[in-house]
Amino acid sequence: MSSHLNGIGNIVPMVVEQSGMGERAFDIYSRLLRERIIFLGTPIDDAVANTIVAQLLFLDAEDSEKDIQLYINSPGGSVYAGMAIYDTIQQIRPDVVTICFGLAASMGAFLLTAGTKGKRMSLPDSRIMIHQPLGGAQGQAIDIEIQAREILYIKAQLNQLLANHTGQPLERIEADTDRDFFMSAEEAKNYGLIDQVISRQNLPTAGENVTIVK
């Protein structure tokens, strides 16, 4: 395994495979994509969303019956970009296994709970945080009013979807997301954000379908 610098200065490991045709090098993320594993390991913006959506659509077209594993370590980011990923997860045919490693906060936590019910997971020492959407506006009074209405709409939409995915009453979601609400993996399981806390013994196997936890 070697490594190189990508355009934003991050080190991306390279994997070299040997065959009868010679050597072929892949960056580690492309190699894992062949095993139907996607990584969301950055704040969420339009560029990140476009990449994640493209990978989801590619794997859907390649095999509609095999699970896709989405590993999440993200502090959140753009609500609109996150909703693009969310809607794609809901629309594609394969089950999407979501796995939190490190931190899933804000839109990261929202995408974690958006995975296929029974297949939403977290490593034991991860942290999960939900809160209301952030926003700000400046300009003329009418412009600020327009932005305020949009933020309130997004807040109501996200709260309702969180209630749907977790099984919590909407009133509790509204209260808990009023400020940053941090949870351990076990607390997130009890809350309904995830279905199981995993360890080495039950870590999903690459390329294999995961049994739904009821």
Curated annotation (Swiss-Prot):
SUPFAM superfamilies: ClpP/crotonase (SSF52096)
Alphabetic keyword roster: Cytoplasm, Hydrolase, Protease, Serine protease
Entry keyword annotation includes Iron: no
Cell compartments where the protein resides: Cytoplasm
Molecular function, one GO term: serine-type endopeptidase activity
Domain of life: Bacteria
Enzyme Commission designation: 3.4.21.92
Active site: 106 (nucleophile), 131
Catalyses which reaction(s): Hydrolysis of proteins to small peptides in the presence of ATP and magnesium. alpha-casein is the usual test substrate. In the absence of ATP, only oligopeptides shorter than five residues are hydrolyzed (such as succinyl-Leu-Tyr-|-NHMec, and Leu-Tyr-Leu-|-Tyr-Trp, in which cleavage of the -Tyr-|-Leu- and -Tyr-|-Trp bonds also occurs)
Pfam families: CLP_protease
Cellular component GO terms, alphabetical: cytoplasm; endopeptidase Clp complex
GO biological process entries: protein quality control for misfolded or incompletely synthesized proteins
Role description: Cleaves peptides in various proteins in a process that requires ATP hydrolysis. Has a chymotrypsin-like activity. Plays a major role in the degradation of misfolded proteins.
Family listed: Belongs to the peptidase S14 family.
Subunit structure and binding partners: Fourteen ClpP subunits assemble into 2 heptameric rings which stack back to back to give a disk-like structure with a central cavity, resembling the structure of eukaryotic proteasomes.
Protein's name according to its UniProt entry: ATP-dependent Clp protease proteolytic subunit 3
Lineage: Bacteria, Bacillati, Cyanobacteriota, Cyanophyceae, Nostocales
